[in-house]
Amino acid sequence: MPEDAQREHSGARARTGQPSGVWWSIDPGEVHVGVAIWDGEQLGTASEMTPRELLGNVWDFQPMLIVIESFSLRSTRWTGAQSKQAVETLKLIGGVEALALMYGGRVVEQQPSVRHIAQRSPWWRELNVPANPHVRSAAAHGLYFLKFSKK
């Protein structure tokens, strides 16, 4: 499929309010990133990659919708290592948002807690998700977007 046609086909939302085409849900992290790739309401692939691989893939594939777990700095008692991890994760989220802005994609941030709602739902059992915790989190954020969010 030509690149322009593929981009046109992967619109962020259908008229029903549900995503159409290919879109991604992401669990960001300093070292490990979980990525779930959806085709409409069907989970396609789910895997783990590095932050650098994620940014390269976002630019290469330019998904028109990206659902990503948000991150906030809550504790003033973090160790130096935890603070570095927090900063790197925030930079990664900003990088994804900047890339999407450059090509016209839409980014939706979700609170980390919503993944638990998705994982307790009856729809979670229908998904074939690898045991990796980052990948499971990414898939849960996608499922939450599909079944519970107000888009």
PLM region spans:
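Phosphate- and other anionic-substrate recognition elements at nucleic-acid/protein interfaces
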Residues: M1-K151
